[in-house]
């Protein structure tokens, strides 16, 4: 697999999702990543540390330049816990849990987050403002309500299917209520 192509596709998709979601500085962005799927394999079966590092480092650079915080979801072997910066865990009141990811428990994305973040910790649960799912890892449990599907500019990174989620406030009040316009809500 061509690493330059994977990096280019990752950059294109992330920048497109950020444009479509209009995330603000300080927002939480969750990443689900199967390096196995990126390489054309079955999720969890052919994990690649190199691919995890390439993708996470690329995304951290893009998000960091915008002041957006990355949370990297692990697999079910770590109960889908997430790696974030300690400062983010403290700022958002997230519960820190004790686990250190491995290639086959947590995955390559989490290992990469531990490598590239300043002070990484694992947290049990978050409510991110938006997220990117590379390889059908199921990030929905970590994106706040109401979740809105985003169609990225590319449908795949490498061989992995790509989807994204944004969120918007719940609409309450009924027939007489009026709602502000936003870029996420479909009218």
UniProtKB/Swiss-Prot annotation:
It comes from the Bacteria. Transmembrane segments: none annotated. InterPro entries: Antibiotic_NAT-like, DUF436. Gene3D superfamilies: Hypothetical protein TT1679 (3.40.50.10360). NCBIfam families: TIGR01440 family protein. Belongs to the UPF0340 family. This is UPF0340 protein SPJ_0612.
């Amino acid at each position: 697999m061509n690493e330059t192509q994977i990096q280019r596709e990752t950059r294109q998709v992330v920048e497109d999702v950020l444009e479509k979601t209009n995330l603000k500085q300080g927002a939480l962005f969750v990443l689900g990543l199967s390096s196995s799927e990126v390489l054309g394999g079955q999720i969890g079966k052919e994990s690649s540390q190199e691919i995890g590092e390439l993708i996470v480092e690329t995304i951290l650079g893009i998000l960091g330049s915008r002041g957006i915080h990355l949370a990297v979801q692990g697999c079910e072997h770590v109960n889908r816990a997430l790696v974030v910066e300690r400062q983010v865990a403290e700022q958002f009141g997230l519960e820190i849990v004790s686990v250190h990811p491995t290639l086959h428990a947590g995955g390559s994305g989490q290992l990469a987050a531990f490598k590239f973040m300043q002070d990484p910790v694992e947290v049990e649960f978050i409510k991110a403002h938006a997220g990117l799912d590379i390889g059908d890892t199921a990030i929905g449990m970590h994106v706040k309500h109401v979740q809105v599907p985003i169609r990225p500019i590319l449908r795949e990174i490498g061989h992995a299917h790509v989807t994204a989620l944004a969120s918007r406030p719940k609409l309450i009040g009924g027939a007489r209520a009026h709602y502000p316009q936003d870029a996420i809500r479909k009218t």
